[in-house]
Amino acid sequence: YMKKITRKLLLALCAFMFLSNMAISQEQKSFTIDKLSVEGRVDFDYEHGKTSTSGIGGKFFNFEMKGSFLNDFSYRIRQRIDMQGSGSKTDFMILSYHAHKNWSITAGKMPLAVGGWEYDLPPIDVYFASLFWNNFPCYDVGAQVEYHSNNKKHDIIFQVTNSTFTPDKFSGMYAYNLIWYGNVGLLKTAYSINMMEQKKGEYINYISLGNDFDFGKMHLVVDFINRGFFNQSDFLFGDFSLIGEVKYAFNDKFTLMAKGGYDRNKHSYFKEVEENGIMIPQPQAYDMTVTPGVEYTFAGLGFEAYPYKGNKNVRLHGFFAFNDLKEPADDMLNPNSSNLELQFNLGVTWRINFAK
């Protein structure tokens, strides 16, 4: 398996070196390579729970290329190789047509348009996260129409993709997403409403509110994601995630951060149905990211450091965090004891830009 990964890396590097030469020497502006980069991340992890484990591992190795052609078209490709053994994944392979200064159309493999700033980050920039972030399969094939305001402070996107909850991409199941990215004074928004088909004709619905407050050296992020089916009695606050993060940049070389969150789903796997005067439990649709009966709490402190002044291509990071996962002991959702885990992490991220 490692030989296959090595061959892929060598072939990809050769291809990227060839493309970088094209980017440097190109004279025709009808086709441009505006970004051509590779990036990787290696971490040391120590985890202490019921057992203790530690080790050094490569987290991610990414290739990214984007640019434009024929004046009205742009493209983006990002290939992510998971160095922990789950293979290669295409995050982005999109083509955009910029029909007007206010309107564009994009199609291809893309992230589902779900609100929230934790969700919006590339995986290589996330250190510890909510249960929803860890479990949601966020990339799929689809198309979207985008509106851009004249002042470039607001983007509204309507997107249709394959349902990300089915492995069969020809099942006729879809996700419908509407998101607003806004810039209103100190506040940047990533608000969305989403309908995602989990079974034929059964949609889980999201209301996702991502808030990023910019106070100069300090950033405060608060995300709230509500999930549920409309036929559930407690559609609001029965199944949700709440995430908060504070970052303070002392200078351009050192940032401290504190982050925490809470995921909860108090819905049931079953609903009571009356048959011949008897109430009988019947299976019902449920959230696949934070399953019924689960409570998950996490919090931690960390830092980011850039050793080279004015250069963000090498980043050191570290954090200490805990998480507590409470799962139901059986299908009747009887509570189980907590599973408290502690995590200590140090790592380095590097980026090489062949074209800018």
Identify what each model region corresponds to.
Residues 90-92, 142, 175-177, 206-208, ...:
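Conserved positions at the start
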Residues 43, 48-51, 70, 98, ...:
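Outer-membrane beta-barrel pore domains
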Residues 1-31, 353-356:
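Cleavable N-terminal export/targeting peptides
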Residues 27-165, 172, 181-183, 257, ...:
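Outer membrane beta-barrel
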Residues 21-22, 105, 150, 209, ...:
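Compositionally biased regions
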Residues 4-5, 106, 256, 348:
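Short alpha-helical segments used as structural interaction elements across diverse proteins
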Residues 157-205:
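Loop-centered beta-sheet repeat module
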